[in-house]
Amino acid sequence: MAYFTIIQGDATDDMRHVAKIAIMQKMINFPSGLKLVFVPNTAVRSVAIGVFVGAGVVRETPDIAGISHFIEHMVFKGTKTRSSFDIVNEIDSIGAQINAFTAKSYTCFHTVSIDTNADKCADVLSDMYFNPAFDQEELEKERRVVIEEINESEDTPDDLCLERLLCNFFKGSQLEKAILGTKKTLKEMNSDTLRAYHSRYYVANNTVVSVAGNLTEEEAVALVNKHFESKYTNIASESMDCDVAERHAHSTSVKKKKEIEQTHIAFAFPSYAYNDERGVAMQLMTIVFSMEMSSRLFQSVREKLGLCYTVYGYPSAYKNNGAFIIYTSTSPENAEKAVRAIRKEIDLLLEKGVSEQELEKGKQQLKTSLVLGQESTSAMMRTFGSHAIQTGELYDFDKRIAQIDATTSEDVLKASREIFDFSNVCASIVAKDDDVDILSIMKDAK
């Protein structure tokens, strides 16, 4: 059980109002290797269910790049007993919601409903997980849909800029591939390709079912046993551990000319892997430096200098790898000024670190975001499910809160100096005129 202490009002005020919120969570390991992560909440009437499968970009070879995401689409196109309409109609008929997403390391299918309809949601998710039809005619149609999704991404400059940045930054590792794949690889896939990948990775010891909401532990276990555990016909013997290669150090830029009004700019610096304990210091640095409207980047580059509408930075963490990303978009004539302004704020951070007041603000924001996440069963399902599929462990709120409280301004400064390595930064620009050398400006500006 975890307790969060949120202090309301001035941190120096002796009259503090303290609220404690208890979270009970549990991981159940089934004989097949399947894991259930359960987070009860009797204060709500909803139940969120997520099926997390360790199938993402990191599992794909270059010739099948994008297959994890393609399967995410195809399981909605029908099972052996349900048509694509049946799937969504059954969910809509009970007022529930169903969706899915693919990340670099995993795929997730999830629902949210009132508690009395949790069994129906689990039944639909189970059917999609175990029995996708992979009909070739439906595959041909959905292939066109995903290609249009790629076209849409390529027509969205910020998406294009960031995707090209990460593919270049992680060049040489499994993470360099785009989640959507390429038009070429998609055109070469057929039903047999999808079935082979599905049969290999949609197995018990590569799956976590995450349940959050108004169920008892006994009800959650019975639900998962009925719709998942009892349906596995054999226990997979192959280890599902995925050894993701560390990124090769390099500092390069990618450029894309596009007839657009603004210049889109992004940088990536090497940072910490998922579950690295230094990640808390990085998160606190992110809040102070680049994430919120009161952050240094926002206040300087947008509010004081008026050089852009959008500027932010955030960490992206994976197994054995991580990137800290900074993005902005501005008019061509302001591109160099914006990069210099960003570099100036980085230099100030590296020289002076964060103040105690900024650190306390960051801690309050980070703890508050964790606590408020409890109020959404969907958020809790995602937090616990994504952590379990990536680490095999239960997310420890007590530990995270203790880490936040224990982090010092010196820890944040040390993390900042480890992350902002200008000899190892990569850049991406999408613009009508890509002649500006943003990488050199970032590396050399003073």
PLM regions with names:
Residues 41, 50-52, 236-296:
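His/Glu-based metal-binding/catalytic segments typifying zinc-dependent metallopeptidases
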Residues 21-46:
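N- or domain-start disorder-to-order transition segments that initiate the globular core
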Residues 40-91, 165, 267, 277-289, ...:
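Active/ligand-binding-proximal structured segments within catalytic/core domains
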Residues 3-4:
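Aromatic (phenylalanine/tyrosine) cluster motif
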Residues 29, 40, 84-237, 244-245, ...:
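Charge-rich, well-structured scaffold segments of protease-associated domains
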Residues 11-18:
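Short hydrophobic alpha-helical segments enriched in small aliphatic residues
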